[in-house]
A protein has these predicted regions:
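A short interface-forming secondary-structure element
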Residues: 43, 47-48, 52-61
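C-terminal binding/interaction regions
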Residues: 1-21, 26-27, 37, 50, ...
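Short, thiol/selenol-centered motifs that function as redox-active sites or metal-ligating centers
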Residues: 34, 56-65, 103
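Alpha-helical support elements that line or immediately flank enzyme active sites
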Residues: 61, 65-76
Length: 128
């Protein structure tokens, strides 16, 4: 498959790879069809994403999408985080081949699950 320079840049030089020692939340998503796995760690401060890291075991566009979302979500509120779409990821990459759309969808599913986990953890911090 032929990927854009932007996809290849994020694959060869992924941003924000790794784990966060004391995250506000951690989520892991697996694509049941192809087996790609994306794990996200996040820290929230003052209602915004202060730090976001990822690890991905998957295809070129899955790694690239994981890298891209860590940059795109930085500094965003939880509502803004959950509003990121697969279409935005694909547009940022100048498109993806049809067989690779699963990569942007996996990244968005992980972001949505992360947003839910962060909302839940914030409710727990507030107490009854």
């Amino acid at each position: 498959m032929i990927y854009s320079e932007k996809v290849l840049e994020h694959f060869h030089h992924p941003r924000n790879v790794g784990e966060i020692e004391r995250p506000s939340a951690v989520v892991e998503m697996t694509n049941p069809v192809c087996g790609d796995v994306l794990k996200l760690w996040a820290v929230v401060e003052d209602g915004r994403i202060a730090e976001l890291k990822f690890k991905c075991e998957g295809c070129i566009p899955a790694v690239a999408a994981g890298s891209w979302v860590t940059e795109a979500a930085h500094g965003k509120s939880l509502d803004e985080l959950m509003a990121i779409t697969a279409r935005q990821i694909e547009a940022a990459f100048g498109g993806l081949p049809p067989a690779s759309h699963h990569a942007s969808e996996l990244a968005v599913a992980a972001l949505k699950r992360l947003g839910q986990a962060l909302r839940h953890s914030q409710r727990d911090d507030v107490g009854p």
